[in-house]
Amino acid sequence: MPDELRLGAVYERSIAASLERLWENVHDWEHLPWVHEGAFSGIELEESGDWGWRARVGLAGGDETLRVELRREPDREVYHTRTLEGPGEGSDTIVRLIPRSERVTDIRVEFWLAVPDEQQAEMFGKGLLTLYARLWDEDEAMMVMRQEVIDGVRSSPARAGTAAPAPLALGPWSELSARLPLAVSTAQGEFRVVETDSGFFAHSVFCPHRGGPLGEGEIEAGHVVCPWHGYRFVLASGRGADGRRCHMAKPPRVELGADGQALLFFADDRIAEA
């Protein structure tokens, strides 16, 4: 490995998110293989704290892994992502966050590479520019949606204890399958109606973890999976299905009414039971 690092490229852009959202995203190691599934296949955390985090990260499309440390500089809006082991070992990506307004932050990313000559630095730098443009596009979309959830622009689930309204008609039961997935907006919140081998189910379109878009989540084995962090929830109960203490409110039921209509019934107690 060379004694010194070489600057491969510099990536600069504006992000439509606050400095607070940027730092939240930087510390959010869990999202890497989910939001960035085209780049990363998995992550195993070793340690994390206010300083940053250290983890083993699988690369998509193969068996290669990186041991990565992300570390903040004290009292500065700067962090380093260093490759401790694996492809690019010794390299240091330095990111500077520059707030421009309440909801706009500029970033400057410097790729300092452990390569023997300038030609290789330039070659790898070009690839990193393409990769990071995609990664920041994906992160920006996540941060914008996260801010909308916090601001209440997107409807959030009704609070526990809210009185149950009358059943909501969804249309003819015989035609429901053909209309799925079906988005339903109610005073109790926004839901998606889906079908599995066990029947019809409705679930909130917002993940209780960080407001992720469950309305875009995959339905697997009776669970809905959050596309941001991979949290899994049981469709029938709203309970977390992956051992993490994170649960949805008890979901409404989809049932056949006496008149042949599909009806959405809301429970009086909206908290999922153990």
Which residue stretches match the model-derived regions?
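Short, hydrophobic/aromatic-rich segments at coil-to-beta transitions
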Residues: 49-55, 74-81, 177-183
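Intrinsic-disorder/low-complexity, polar/charged segments enriched in Ser/Thr/Lys/Arg/Asp/Glu/Gln
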Residues: 6-14, 52, 92, 104-106, ...
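Short cysteine clusters
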Residues: 207, 226-229
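Beta-strand/loop substructures that line and gate deep hydrophobic ligand-binding cavities in soluble
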Residues: 82-131, 262-264
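Hydrophobic ligand-binding cavity/cleft-lining segments
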Residues: 1-49
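N-terminal pre-ligand scaffold of iron-sulfur
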Residues: 20-24, 33-40, 133-221, 234-235, ...
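Hydrophobic-ligand binding "helix-grip"
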Residues: 34, 39-42, 58-102, 271
